[in-house]
Amino acid sequence: MKYISVAVDGPAGSGKSTITKMVAEKLGYNYVDTGAMYRAITYNFLNNDLKELNEEKVIKFLSTLKFDVKFIDKKQYVLINGEDVSEKIRTAEVSKFTSLFAKSPAVREFLIDTQRNLAKSNNIIMDGRDIASVVLPNADVKIFLTASVEERARRRVLDFERQGITDVNYEKVKEEIKARDYQDENRDIAPLIKVDSAIDTTELTIDQVVEKIIELIKFKENL
């Protein structure tokens, strides 16, 4: 059986996670949140007081790490050493350090094999920053989501508020997003690359973006 793979890339706060989850739910696909995997690795490093990119220490931590991704009723769970950390990784501190550790060749190699294997056993939609260019270069559908820095910062602040985190400064979040954009676009390993099927979500509702993506996937399914 031929499974359909959908790669969705985009910068921080572009709506990737929210939108791809909705698309996956409507189509019955598995939603693979690669960002959660990098966050989980980062969460583990921070819990072990690793806050700098030291490749030797990174490799040492990874060598003893038990990492697993499971799907239950189409929902993804990320486990570190047997513990479900899916909710614990959604903090401002983890967000701040995730882009740093994503630069690590060891971290990327550790996760990419896992991500590719997930695409072999089901219809999947996967989001991240280098899915179309590196992880799934032969994906059936490739999409790039973006939005203005101001809109992405606004969305990120709302996300924190929904989690009960109310002491978040909008201007600080905006500057962090700008810095992360620069890091993602200029890193030596797998920089963020805009593919042809780009959708600017700044002025679109979530439902409008979801429908645009579903149209692209349905077209591919019917070929």
Where are these predicted regions, by residue range?
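Hydrophobic anchor at the beta1->P-loop junction of P-loop NTPases
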Residues: 6-8
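ATP-dependent NMP and nucleoside kinases share a basic, alpha-helical "lid"
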Residues: 86-98, 102-162
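N-terminal phosphate/diphosphate-binding loop that engages ATP/GTP or pyrophosphate donors
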Residues: 26-90
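Glycine-rich phosphate-binding loops of nucleotide-dependent enzymes
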Residues: 142-145, 149-151, 156-160, 191, ...
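ATP-binding Walker
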Residues: 11-14
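Walker A/P-loop
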Residues: 17
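Small-molecule kinase domains that catalyze NTP-dependent phosphoryl transfer to phosphate-bearing small molecules
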Residues: 70, 115-122, 129-134, 138, ...
